[in-house]
């Protein structure tokens, strides 16, 4: 059996789809379906069972078994970068993951967990090393602290444990995330609603819409996860991005190009940069994927010119 925590969420449900594509259906999905809309992410998936995350955590902390477990993909977390309830974030993102690590290591079960590029703060270097890590919010700090925890104990661990520092992921099954969904998702909806896009004006020395992020399609994220499943000797913390920064304007133009002829207008409106985000906003990210390549991963990554149209095709079938 393979366990996927956060399996009804964005990346988790796509990992389930990726496993299904391999013919793997002996999957235990762990999640919190308080927001029942997330069940739609699993409506076309084949799984063995579902378990509420609180029940799962109680069983993990009680050191109970779940039968033979091949691997754990730990994607469950509070992913809101604007959540400042530190006790809540630390309980969900840090303590939960520590408990799961102890359970997995004791049984030599591979644990592949979601970290985040947010640990790097404002950058400008995005490499998996302590001197470049400067988290700016509770979410980032919780991810950073667990990465530090792993580093302390890694020398004594003889099973696979991998932290994946996801950069700006976009793609299918993120609709439940609301304001935290990708700009590609919001651009699609804006064009459907009004035919125009809204982007922030310039900040931190960047012109209007010229802030840059490393945007990675969720299919590429899944490919990295499945490669790690196939390569249990690979361990450590790795950036998962394309290795190329692209501007929000480039994402916007990819969306506009796809929508061309199907919507009225098609312009971009630049809006004032929010004051509450100044000093807390990553205006530039670009994954250094040297470590991932050196570990042996050879897969190619989609630029936004390819990934965004692919995603919008998927969304259009469900509009």
Swiss-Prot record:
Top-rank taxon: Bacteria
Protein name (database record): ADP-L-glycero-D-manno-heptose-6-epimerase
Entry's EC annotation: 5.1.3.20
Task performed by this protein: Catalyzes the interconversion between ADP-D-glycero-beta-D-manno-heptose and ADP-L-glycero-beta-D-manno-heptose via an epimerization at carbon 6 of the heptose.
Family named by the database record: Belongs to the NAD(P)-dependent epimerase/dehydratase family. HldD subfamily.
Subunit structure comment from the entry: Homopentamer.
Pathway entry: Nucleotide-sugar biosynthesis; ADP-L-glycero-beta-D-manno-heptose biosynthesis; ADP-L-glycero-beta-D-manno-heptose from D-glycero-beta-D-manno-heptose 7-phosphate: step 4/4
Coiled coil: none
Gene that this sequence comes from: hldD
Keywords recorded for this protein, A-Z: Carbohydrate metabolism, Isomerase, NADP
């Amino acid at each position: 059996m393979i366990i996927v925590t956060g399996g009804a969420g964005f990346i988790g449900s796509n990992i389930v789809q990726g496993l299904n594509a391999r013919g793997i259906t002996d999957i235990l999905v762990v999640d919190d379906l308080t927001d029942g809309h997330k069940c739609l992410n699993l409506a076309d998936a084949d799984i063995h069972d579902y378990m509420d995350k609180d029940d799962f955590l109680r069983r993990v902390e009680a050191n109970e078994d779940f039968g033979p477990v091949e691997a754990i993909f730990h994607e469950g977390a509070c992913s809101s970068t604007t959540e400042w309830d530190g006790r809540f974030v630390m309980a969900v993102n840090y303590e939960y993951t520590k408990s799961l690590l102890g359970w997995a290591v004791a049984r030599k079960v591979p644990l592949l967990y979601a970290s985040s590029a947010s640990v790097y703060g404002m950058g400008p270097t995005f490499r998996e090393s302590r001197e470049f890590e400067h988290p700016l919010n509770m979410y980032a700090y919780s991810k950073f602290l667990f990465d530090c925890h792993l580093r302390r104990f890694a020398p004594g661990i003889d099973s696979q444990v991998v932290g994946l520092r996801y950069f700006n992921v976009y793609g299918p099954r993120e609709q439940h995330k609301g304001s935290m969904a990708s700009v590609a998702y919001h651009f699609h909806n804006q064009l459907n609603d009004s035919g125009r896009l809204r982007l922030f004006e310039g900040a931190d020395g960047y012109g209007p819409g010229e802030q840059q992020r490393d945007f990675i399609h969720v299919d590429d994220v899944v490919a990295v996860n499945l490669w790690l499943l196939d390569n249990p000797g690979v361990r450590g913390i790795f950036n998962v991005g394309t290795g190329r920064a692209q501007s929000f304007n480039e994402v916007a133009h990819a969306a506009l190009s796809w929508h061309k002829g199907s919507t009225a207008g098609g312009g971009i409106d630049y809006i004032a940069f929010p004051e509450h985000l100044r000093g807390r906003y990553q205006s530039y990210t670009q994954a250094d994927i040297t470590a991932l390549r050196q570990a042996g991963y050879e897969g190619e990554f989609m630029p936004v010119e390819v990934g965004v149209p692919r995603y919008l095709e998927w969304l259009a079938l469900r509009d």
